[in-house]
Amino acid sequence: YFNHPDSLTLENQEKISQALDTLGYKKNKLAKVLANGKSEFIGIIVPNLYLHYYSEMLTQLLSSYSNYHYKFLVFSSEHGAEEEQQYIEELLSYQIEGLIVLSHTLSSQKLASYQIPVIAIEREAEYISSITTDNYMGSLQATSLLIRDKCDILIHINVNVEKTVPAYDRIRAFEETCKEYQVPYDIDLSVSGNSYQEILNVIRRIFTRIEEKYPNQKKGIFLANDTYANMFLNLIFQKYGYFPDTYELVGFDNSPIAS
């Protein structure tokens, strides 16, 4: 009945179905796993959930259940490589069929050593499969927009990204485009922190520095992601009560917060 219902007559199928309803039968997923060796679990590791990009990506991944029926086990690895390795060992104990990694903690070579399918999203992925956006083109378009809008100084705000990480191309494209068009620019890679508040404090210091260093100039600010851009926007409104024409902001990621 469960594996080959077509081998039964419709009458017998109906009888069995009624009996199961009477008995209050519920499907036993564990029995199915033991029978076919497939857990239908996929592990997901994100670095945090306070950056809107990661929370939105997680939302999109989880919403795929209705189409593909895979279940997800999710860990947030905010405290280093040792913790992330423990999470992966825990996931492996559930016989996950694959792993989706958005964190940057473990090398792709280490991830490949676990001998399961691994998909990286926007991170170093020399030894595993990966999905990335065209970071260079996105940065080029953002920088070109600020140049076309005749900003006096262009400023890029980011973390100190390693060159092996795809997002480094945002920094590279910004600098190369500014040099090509011979426009003044400033790159600030001092953003860091392990919480939303810590990052906001850094963005606030950067905002204060920019205010002091570039008064009365039209400042074109290209921020590494939409969360940073939203923080910066709020700081502008907190100071001025409106959005002055001495600022133009561009984020990256198309997170819902940018709407």
Regions found by a protein language model. Give the residues of each.
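Short gly/ser/thr-rich secondary-structure transition/capping motifs
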Residues: 22-28, 82, 100-103, 233
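Generic recognition of short, well-ordered alpha-helical segments
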Residues: 29, 55-57, 86, 168-169, ...
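Bacterial carbohydrate/catabolite-sensing allosteric modules
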Residues: 21-22, 63-68, 92, 116-120, ...
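Alpha-helical recognition/docking segments in bacterial nutrient-uptake
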Residues: 37-144, 212
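N-terminal helix-turn-helix DNA-binding module of bacterial transcription factors
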Residues: 1-38
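Secondary-structure boundary/capping motif
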Residues: 8, 53-54, 83, 165-166, ...
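Short, glycine/serine-rich, charged loops/turns that create anion-binding
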Residues: 2-5, 49-50, 79, 106, ...
